[in-house]
Amino acid sequence: MSESDTDPDIDDDAHNNGDNDVDVAVDESESAETTTDTDTASANAKLFGEWDVSEIEYEDPSTQRYITVTPIAHTMGRHAAKQFEKSKISVVERLINRLMQTEDNTGHKQKTMNIVEDAFDTIHNRTEENPVQVLVRGVENAAPREETVRLKYGGISVPQAVDVAPQRRVDQALKFIADGTQRGSYKSAQSAADSLAQVIIGAANYDVQSYAVGQKEESERVAEAAR
């Protein structure tokens, strides 16, 4: 065989390799497009199909890390068995779970989600703001900075003021909001959704007449007296 002759097997291999390179390039392009579409869909997702959570602003830097906002209102208890993982759950779902701890709503996740969804509609109608933003501001305002613990000295129990950890501050704020909702709607003509909206708006405006803010002020007042 002369040097000018080419091996047909080599030509076939080169041709096949070229086809493989094209296939790989096409697959990578399709994968990149799929990833981009998924990211875009995630960015455009809205809570309850209505409320944008991508531009929520925080005023309290100490609790910002523990007030998570996502467009997902139900994660199927994914973090239930992991300590401190609750801070990765959306604050809206945590509020829903808190409301479920009352007697009538225990275990009724869909019912409680409907209450929160209706409350958000009411908040938007009254304030013309994003209700998720109003909730975040309400949680920040209702989170106590000080509370008391009881220490025993020689058999005597003495109250002592302590600073509240940021994660517990958020826990307490959600508890106050849920308790205020239950108190406002129990044996009352006011619905749970209206009661919840009223408590959240009051907390967001730092209204001392609001149950959540009142409980926060009471906790800090008792702690100040125990210093």
Curated annotation (Swiss-Prot):
Where, if anywhere, are coiled coils annotated? none
Q: Which GO terms describe its molecular function?
A: rRNA binding; structural constituent of ribosome
The source's superkingdom equals Archaea
Cited InterPro entries: Ribosomal_uS7, Ribosomal_uS7_arc, Ribosomal_uS7_dom, Ribosomal_uS7_dom_sf, Ribosomal_uS7_euk/arc
Protein keywords? Ribonucleoprotein, Ribosomal protein, RNA-binding, rRNA-binding
Q: What is an example of a Pfam family matching this protein?
A: Ribosomal_S7
Q: List all Low complexity biased stretches.
A: 32-43
Give any single GO term for biological process.
translation
Gene Ontology cellular-component annotations: small ribosomal subunit
Chain residue ranges for the region called Disordered:
1-43
Q: Where is the composition biased (Acidic residues)?
A: 1-12, 20-31
Function noted in UniProt: One of the primary rRNA binding proteins, it binds directly to 16S rRNA where it nucleates assembly of the head domain of the 30S subunit. Is located at the subunit interface close to the decoding center.
The entry assigns this protein to a family as follows:
Belongs to the universal ribosomal protein uS7 family.
What does the subunit section of this Swiss-Prot or TrEMBL entry state? Answer: Part of the 30S ribosomal subunit.
The record's listing under NCBIfam families reads: PRK04027.1, uS7_euk_arch
PANTHER family documented for this protein: RIBOSOMAL PROTEIN S7
What's the protein called, per UniProt? Small ribosomal subunit protein uS7
Query: Which species is this record about?
Result: Haloquadratum walsbyi (strain DSM 16790 / HBSQ001)
Q: What gene is it encoded by? A: rps7
